Amino acid sequence: MASTSNVTELIFTGLFQDPAVQSVCFVVFLPVYLATVVGNGLIVLTVSISKSLDSPMYFFLSCLSLVEISYSSTIAPKFIIDLLAKIKTISLEGCLTQIFFFHFFGVAEILLIVVMAYDCYVAICKPLHYMNIISRQLCHLLVAGSWLGGFCHSIIQILVIIQLPFCGPNVIDHYFCDLQPLFKLACTDTFMEGVIVLANSGLFSVFSFLILVSSYIVILVNLRNHSAEGRHKALSTCASHITVVILFFGPAIFLYMRPSSTFTEDKLVAVFYTVITPMLNPIIYTLRNAEVKIAIRRLWSKKENPGRE
């Protein structure tokens, strides 16, 4: 951190100012976060022990669920605890740590969604060569690449923010640490830093979104050569992917691809993609996937009847 900084602690304004509303939010968001951890954790457990789900598609799905848990846990626990606190504080080092892991897991999730789209493309457009192309080694490399991409992205974000001097005030108009609200507290011009963040976050999201849209267009065009049953199964899988893409990329593009003025709308949108969306993803994937639902039923059946094989 720059030597001119004398701010060591930051204060969040929070999502709402009314204590009664904050109490209601606590009652709502605590079960949502617990459902996120349990739902995504159940997918990870089911895929890891179910032989019927031993395919690249479900391997990627379990990795995505693991990232969802990590991504939501970066923000949600402190946010929920702060709903009951009169003064919501975080150290400057804790703020930077939160920014790092928030962007790390966020970009890792984006890249995993792109990987899953590629897997879907190969499965539908090149089914005869699927096992040769999507090998176990490639699966591990793609997942490792997603995590590495998230790490590199976060390092850039931290290098941008760590050079800024913070002389006061120390109140962040948000309920968690992110770059744009923190820029408002810097006692120097942050135009260039804002441009770097726009290029690193916003344009990255848009570029990834365009890749995803292009891949789904190619998939839909190729579905004309499939049977009615094959089209139905492929469309069901694609519908789940597309729904997750819209839920994740919509808010991200809204936040990072427009000038910042006030953060009232930003905070409401941020709640959606930091708390709500991670809970919805396992529901979206399991409700439209018969194999996952059957595997989960078998898992529970074994727990209830441990003597049965």
From Swiss-Prot:
Asked if the record carries the keyword Cell membrane, the reply is yes
Residues in a coiled coil are none
Instruction: State the disulfide connectivity.
Output: C95-C187
Residue ranges crossing the lipid bilayer per the database entry? 24-47, 56-77, 99-118, 138-156, 194-217, 234-256, 268-287
Q: Which InterPro entries match?
A: GPCR_Rhodpsn, GPCR_Rhodpsn_7TM, Olfact_rcpt, Olfactory_Receptors
Q: Which UniProt keywords apply?
A: Cell membrane, Disulfide bond, G-protein coupled receptor, Glycoprotein, Membrane, Olfaction, Receptor, Sensory transduction, Transducer, Transmembrane, Transmembrane helix
Top-level taxon of the source organism:
Eukaryota
**Where does the protein principally reside?**
membrane
- Entry's Gene Ontology molecular function annotations: G protein-coupled receptor activity; olfactory receptor activity
Q: Its topology with respect to the membrane?
A: Multi-pass membrane protein
Q: Which residues lie on this side of the membrane: Extracellular?
A: 1-23, 78-98, 157-193, 257-267
Q: Which residues are glycosylated?
A: N6
Pull the Cytoplasmic topological domain ranges from the record: 48-55, 119-137, 218-233, 288-309
Q: Which Pfam families match?
A: 7tm_4
One GO CC term on file: plasma membrane
Compartment annotation: Cell membrane
Extract the CDD domains matched here: 7tmA_OR4A-like
Q: What is the purpose of this protein? A: Odorant receptor.
Protein family per UniProt: Belongs to the G-protein coupled receptor 1 family.
Tell me the protein's name. Answer: Olfactory receptor 4B1
The organism's lineage is: Eukaryota, Metazoa, Chordata, Craniata, Vertebrata
- Which gene does this sequence derive from? OR4B1
